[in-house]
Regions:
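A domain-start/cap signature at the N-terminus of enzymes
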Residues: 1-47, 76, 95, 119, ...
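Cell-envelope and extracellular/periplasmic
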Residues: 51-55, 84, 111, 126-128, ...
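Alpha/beta-hydrolase active-site loop
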Residues: 93-114
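The feature captures the conserved acid-bearing segment of alpha/beta-hydrolase catalytic domains
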Residues: 146-147, 152-236, 250-253
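C-terminal catalytic histidine-bearing segment of alpha/beta-hydrolase fold enzymes
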Residues: 186-189, 215-217, 223-286
């Protein structure tokens, strides 16, 4: 393992940095941690980025995630960016950075490496990290992202106002209507009993916004909005397409856009999604 400002040539495991300036910092080195498989079975590897939740830590979450996902760790370049002050800037968090730009800079950098497949980037986020994944899916113009995975944070009512997707903007005003890029695969995960992010929509009792508490789109409505954005023209699913124990899957566009309802779980619902379930989605298995 080593630390370097920027990887060049063949990517190896280590800590790297993106330099960024914003209202809180000037020319600040923002870290991200990379794990590259030791003996990969392909020359160019797909990339999986994991975005921690508010209060989380990339360095701490990395070993646990790798341990819980050994098959993925052997097949993917695994990347763990660090949020400024352990947060991602969505509405009223400690970070006021342009976090979309930070993640896009990581993607641009890694996509140029010899052993990376530039067309196979996945980004998964949990809670506050998932809100940033939503922002990326709404706003990014990068062609590299193939999969978006969000856990316990469906679209909030800033990102979709009931009629349109909205870009965050420099002051978190969410005023500009945008059309997300099509062609992505999307998996969303929510717990039916989440006390922080209401499964059936409405304001969070806890999560702050600039004015009051942050509101959320209902989880099943959120995936329907994503399905329509990706080209679906049918009716909203009122019943799950498939049930596997406490997991209820709502699948659109032949499994391209999927919501997983974790019955009885709260804000830790991501823990119910095992490696096999995640790989089934990433590798386009029915």
């Amino acid at each position: 393992m080593h630390a370097a400002e920027k990887p060049e040539g063949t990517l190896s495991s280590g800590e790297y940095f993106i330099r960024q300036s914003w209202s809180q910092e000037q020319d600040f080195s923002r870290p991200y941690h990379v794990h590259v498989p030791a003996n990969p079975d392909r020359r160019k590897l797909p990339v999986f980025l994991f975005l921690h939740g508010n209060g989380g830590n990339a360095r701490a979450s990395m070993p646990a995630f790798l341990r819980q996902h050994p098959v993925m760790a052997a097949r993917y370049v695994m990347v763990f960016p660090q949020g400024y002050q352990n947060s991602w800037n969505i509405s009223a968090e400690r970070s006021q950075a342009d976090d979309r730009l930070f993640i896009e800079a990581i993607v641009d950098t890694l996509a140029a490496c010899d052993n990376v497949d530039p067309d196979q980037f996945t980004v998964m986020g949990v809670s506050n990290g998932a809100a940033l994944v939503n922002q990326l899916a709404i706003e990014t113009q990068l062609p590299n992202f193939r999969h978006y995975v969000t856990a316990v944070s469906p679209l909030n009512d800033l990102q979709h106002d009931g009629r349109n997707f909205k870009a965050k903007g420099d002051d978190n005003g969410y005023e500009t209507i945008v059309t997300p890029r099509t062609g992505a695969r999307i998996l969303t995960i929510s717990g039916s009993e989440d006390p922080l992010v209401p499964y059936y929509g409405g304001p969070s009792p806890v999560i702050p916004a600039k004015n009051g508490k942050l509101g959320f789109v209902a989880a099943e409505e959120s995936i329907f909005l994503w399905a329509k954005a990706m080209g679906y023209r049918g009716a909203k699913l009122e019943k799950p397409s498939r049930i596997d124990g406490k997991l209820e899957f709502f699948s659109y566009l032949n499994g391209t856009v999927v919501h997983c309802k974790v019955v009885g779980e709260g804000h830790g619902a991501a823990g119910a999604i095992d490696q096999a379930t995640l790989l089934r989605f990433l590798e386009h298995q029915p």
